């Protein structure tokens, strides 16, 4: 069935092959595409799980996000996203927060995610503070902007 499932005209097996590319941008694209395909790409779960060990942080984040969309949320994908909240690169922290926020208000590991996101409310980078605050708002199921956004004006 996977040969019939495609994203941008490319099949699941072809996107899985991209996860092994020597080019980290191609690996990230492969993870992104598999995440866009979602549950129909279940044959890619083990390959996405392997990509969680990629040497490039942004590939790990996109692989974790894809795994969370392809497989039921929780497990290793959430663990990787939470770990990447502590990355030295601001864009990786911001991206991890963004993806955690989109998992919804109930998933295994949400308590740890909420704790780490609250810690990021004081991050030195404004983009990280914004994404952490928005993720907190989504995960806590509040329609109003979270109070953490107030720290952005200081």
Label each PLM-derived region with a short phrase.
Residues 6-18, 39-53, 72-86, 107-121, ...:
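Amphipathic alpha-helical scaffolding segments comprising HEAT/armadillo-like alpha-solenoid repeats
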Residues 1-8, 25-40, 50, 58-73, ...:
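Structural detector for internal amphipathic alpha-helices that build alpha-solenoid repeat scaffolds
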């Amino acid at each position: 069935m996977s040969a019939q499932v495609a994203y941008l005209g490319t099949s699941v097996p072809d996107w899985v092959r991209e996860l092994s590319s020597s080019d980290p941008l191609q690996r990230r694209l492969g993870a992104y595409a598999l995440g866009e395909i979602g549950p129909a790409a279940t044959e890619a779960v083990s390959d996405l799980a392997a990509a969680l060990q990629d040497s490039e942080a942004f590939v790990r984040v996109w692989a974790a996000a894809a795994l969370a969309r392809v497989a039921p949320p929780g497990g290793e994908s959430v663990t990787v996203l939470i770990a990447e909240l502590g990355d030295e690169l601001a864009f990786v922290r911001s991206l991890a927060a963004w993806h955690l926020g989109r998992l919804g208000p109930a998933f295994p590991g949400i308590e740890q995610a909420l704790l780490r996101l609250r810690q990021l409310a004081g991050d030195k980078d404004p983009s990280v503070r914004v994404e952490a605050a928005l993720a907190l708002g989504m995960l806590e199921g509040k329609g109003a902007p979270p109070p953490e956004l107030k720290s952005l004006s200081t």
